């Protein structure tokens, strides 16, 4: 039997998610407030160990909606978590070069220097993993492998959760204002230390335009889903096992607020772009460039077969590159009961 929960910790990545909109609209707080549960932002905590749970999901009674790499790593490392939803919002995934580098297409990458971030102090370096994934997917389209390029690492000290959140006018940047910036490989590209790099999302298109970079390929627009599959495709909505076992109604309430936000987004494209711009610390223009003018229609959390297959393929990739200690069956990680409970409730109301 579900027991009342005092506090739910929530976190989401600075990317398009239904949870992010549900938080901004107050719907998560409303849904759980009716159960006597208050919500608290994990990312805004002054405690570094609490903020680190965004990556290792160590905090009990917490929900996370965002990039799948940390969630997969946590599961592979023994964290008792379950996925209750998957969302697939395609985004730009760019391999970029300087315009005078001579790199015009993927074939031209052979034998060239490719810059990779290297957060050696992080439990899971999701930035490195997603860059290698983007590179590998691009190269395989031309019969090439990652070994066909020269990898150049850009070491970054500390972890992703070291800095306390920095906020202006209610808008925060997760990770604070890190000395040296968040993309040392971009600096390396501009200095001529490497020939190409990988960036994705709203900031990728903004930086590419600002610095006049050449887009070698956008794997995020490829017609094959497994080529587009990366950290954000699909994204995972995950909770800890204790929350499911002890506070099942809370898990259902979380998912219900996410689906409510996504349904609202379908009918409110302009408002949705504004919310997504706030979520991604970007502007509405760059959100449209990165996630499409139909970004409001891409917010769909479910458990469809395409997403499950892509998540398994991505998990296998992470194991092959030793980003996770062991592989596992994604289907065993998924708990469909909260989604089934919501659908059953809708059917009863309709009947």
Q: What are these model-derived regions, one by one?
A:
Residues 318-351:
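Conserved C-terminal helix/tail region of periplasmic/extracytoplasmic solute-binding proteins
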Residues 69, 160-276:
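Pocket-lining segment of extracytoplasmic ligand-binding domains
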Residues 247-323:
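Secondary-structure end/capping motifs
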Residues 82-89, 150-154, 212-231, 329:
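Short beta-strand->loop
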Residues 4-147, 151-155, 162:
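Short, glycine-/small- and polar/acidic-enriched structural segments
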